[in-house]
């Protein structure tokens, strides 16, 4: 795979597509376009390329596509094929004060790769492939534009290794996106999140300088960890072009369990006890009764599915802990795990729901075990209180010794009599209020407003409060590394020289 997968067609001819977000867009003049063309393998100002580069998988954009609109198009799409070309593009744009929005598979759901202020969309899919692999030390170099299936097939077929990173967007996303958004995979309890896997980075700064961070050993005490500075920065501090990662032998053993709990809180406590004892099954997912009904046809219980893969001795020990801590639960058919595996990455219903008039999205947050049951109840109640809500539900998707991620789903629909103009306004108001309710409850509980989807545009308005005084530190780092503010402006809630950040 070498190209992004659009979430839904745009219902307009390329030349008729319009921008939905109202912002001051920066043009690329003929001279800069020529110089970029000389520096980069491919540049395009074709309407169809600009339209696709003007959106990602942000759910609001699905509804707009049905009206022939995208969030915001760039003036030009640049497609480099190596780090030197990325460096040249950034140096030229920095000199010209033209914004640059880096992107890979554009599978993000928070608008992080939308070029809000026009300028250049930097498509990194051409920087693909697996570099050096040290099978003895279990270290591999992966280029930023490599899509998930190509990572796993390259490591497994050639070396008998796995990265162990399996996000829901596996088929749609790239190494660079995983790093930039601080992603997490479905097997993360065993293998860690992307920040646990990465050892070092190659990064291009706003002025074109190429820097390498970390990667020289399993650990160092050489000042602050600069690798982690860029992980989760969403392209606002630099453009990641390559990463060095810990990898693992493909495991020999696998085991599965499925049980049900009388309450979501009871299931959460079982997960807490499992992690507390040091067991870390790759998959430990707890669904509330609403989602248990939707996913497993078991609305009478709160389903916990468990899947682990490891050396057989370690696997047996892990599953023994799971069995002991779930002894009081209802035993369920382990085929529920097969059912999850078959559908875990299926998001085919998303676009049809939006096109049918249903507003639907997911919000993942994280908090300590001590507050999770109360946070779950508070969010589901708050979402249910937003006028128009059809359903509000949750599952626990990633767990730690000290807490877990709650992954909420909400869906709403405007009143039947709403006319098209009124419906458009209703969608924006409902969507924003639903997000506000989840985020407010999370902040009040002392939790993290995002676990693995990132901030992008959609959550930018919350980050200053979510980080507190540390947000000023982030803004200072941004100013130091990108003094002209060209890198992905309008994201993470950071100040931008290009004008007010638009919102629908």
Regions found by a protein language model. Give the residues of each.
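C-terminal substrate-recognition/cap domain of FAD-linked oxidoreductases
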Residues: 44-64, 249, 255-437, 441, ...
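Activity-critical C-terminal alpha-helical subdomain
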Residues: 209, 456-504
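FAD-binding subdomain of flavoenzyme oxidoreductases
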Residues: 129-285, 486-487, 499-504
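N-terminal flexible segment immediately upstream of the FAD-binding catalytic core
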Residues: 1-91, 108-138, 289-295, 336-360, ...
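Short, ordered loop/turn segments at secondary-structure junctions
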Residues: 104-107, 168, 286-289, 454
């Amino acid at each position: 795979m070498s190209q992004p997968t659009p979430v839904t067609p745009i219902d307009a001819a390329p030349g008729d597509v319009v921008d939905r977000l109202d912002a001051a867009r920066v043009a690329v003049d003929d001279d800069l376009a020529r110089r970029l063309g000389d520096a980069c393998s491919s540049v395009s100002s074709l309407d169809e390329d600009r339209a696709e580069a003007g959106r990602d998988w942000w759910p609001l954009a699905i509804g707009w596509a049905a009206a022939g609109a995208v969030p915001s198009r760039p003036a030009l799409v640049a497609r480099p094929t190596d780090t030197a070309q990325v460096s040249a593009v950034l140096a030229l744009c920095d000199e010209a004060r033209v914004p640059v929005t880096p992107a890979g598979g554009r599978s993000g759901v928070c608008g992080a790769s939308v070029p809000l202020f026009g300028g250049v969309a930097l498509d990194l899919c051409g920087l693909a492939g697996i570099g050096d692999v040290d099978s003895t030390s279990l270290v591999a170099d992966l280029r930023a534009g490599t899509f998930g299936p190509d990572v796993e097939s390259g490591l497994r077929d050639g070396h008998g290794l796995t990265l162990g990173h399996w996000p829901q967007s596996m088929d749609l996303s790239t190494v660079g996106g995983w790093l930039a958004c601080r992603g997490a995979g479905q097997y993360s309890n065993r293998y860690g999140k992307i920040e646990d896997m990465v050892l070092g980075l190659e990064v291009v700064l706003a002025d074109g300088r190429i820097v390498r961070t970390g990667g020289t050993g399993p650990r160092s005490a050489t000042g602050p960890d600069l690798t982690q500075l860029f992980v989760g920065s969403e392209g606002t501090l630099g453009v990641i072009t390559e990463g060095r990662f810990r990898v693992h032998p493909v495991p020999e053993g696998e085991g599965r369990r499925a049980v049900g709990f009388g309450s979501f809180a009871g299931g959460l406590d079982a997960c807490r006890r499992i992690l507390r004892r040091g067991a870390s099954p790759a998959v430990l997912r707890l669904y509330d009764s609403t989602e248990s009904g939707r996913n497993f046809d078991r609305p009478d219980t709160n389903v916990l599915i468990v899947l682990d893969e490891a050396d057989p001795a370690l696997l047996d020990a892990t599953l023994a802990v799971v069995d002991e801590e779930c002894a009081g639960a209802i035993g369920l058919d382990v085929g529920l795990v097969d059912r999850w595996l078959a559908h875990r990455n299926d998001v085919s219903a998303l676009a049809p729901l939006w096109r049918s008039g249903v507003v639907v999205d997911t919000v993942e947050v994280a908090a300590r075990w001590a507050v999770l049951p109360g946070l779950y109840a508070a969010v589901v109640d708050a979402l249910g209180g937003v006028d128009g809500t059809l359903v509000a539900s949750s599952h626990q998707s990633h767990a730690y010794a000290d807490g877990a991620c709650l992954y909420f789903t909400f869906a709403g629909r405007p009143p039947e009599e709403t006319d098209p103009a009124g419906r458009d306004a209703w969608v924006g108001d409902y969507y924003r209020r639903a997000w506000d309710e989840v985020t407010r409850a999370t902040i009040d509980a002392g939790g993290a407003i995002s676990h693995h989807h990132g901030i992008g545009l959609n959550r930018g308005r919350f980050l200053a409060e979510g980080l507190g005084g540390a947000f000023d530190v982030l803004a200072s780092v941004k100013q130091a590394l990108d003094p002209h503010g060209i890198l992905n402006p309008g994201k993470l809630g950071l100040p931008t020289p290009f004008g007010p950040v638009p919102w629908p």
